[in-house]
Amino acid sequence: MSAIKNKIEINLITTGTGLMFFGLWTFIKFFLTIVFLGVEYDDNTSDEVKLIATIITIIAVAIISALFCYVGLSARAEGKGKKKSVVYLIVNGFLLFFHILIIILEAVALLFGENILTIIITMIIDATAAVLMSEVMINSIKLRKIRRHKRIMEVGYEL
């Protein structure tokens, strides 16, 4: 039982680290894209609308990246034995749900898209993130069950 618990803890630490870096990479990639490639707007769009749209987009990407980092840090902490609330698993579930939707939309775009290689690479990256989020969810639930079972065995009854 202890070996299984250790393996799950290591998996949580590893996948949590992966999600943290995925969140950081998402923000860095987005920022570099804006800096080096700029943002395309319709010619009729006013400068104020362009600025507002850019700011809202930056804030949204920053929030999403922060959520990935939050889930990653929480998974690492749980893997290291710290008690974490269920909130990070709920956030992880929402991120996973939206990532699955994005993968489906990318698959549809693959049918009608022009830049097929870019779409395929993006799908692979998003699928990898979805696997990491799934692993965090599964391993966290397993670890909580093992720890709960251990507490019950130590006390002799369920609290």
What are these regions (language model features)?
Residues 1-36, 46-51, 158-159:
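Cytosolic juxtamembrane helix and N-cap/initiation of the first transmembrane helix
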Residues 7, 45, 83-87, 113-120:
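Alpha-helical rod/repeat scaffolding segments in eukaryotic adaptors/tethers
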Residues 40-61, 120-124:
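Transmembrane alpha-helix entry/boundary detector in multi-pass membrane proteins
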Residues 67-99, 103:
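Loop-to-transmembrane helix junctions at the membrane interface
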Residues 15-23, 98, 102-146:
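Alpha-helical membrane-associated segments of multi-pass integral membrane proteins
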Residues 29-40, 102-109:
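Helix-to-loop junction signature of class
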Residues 53-71, 98, 126-129:
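Generic alpha-helical transmembrane segments
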Residues 4-6, 69-84, 130-159:
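Cytosolic juxtamembrane helix at the C-terminal end of the final transmembrane segment
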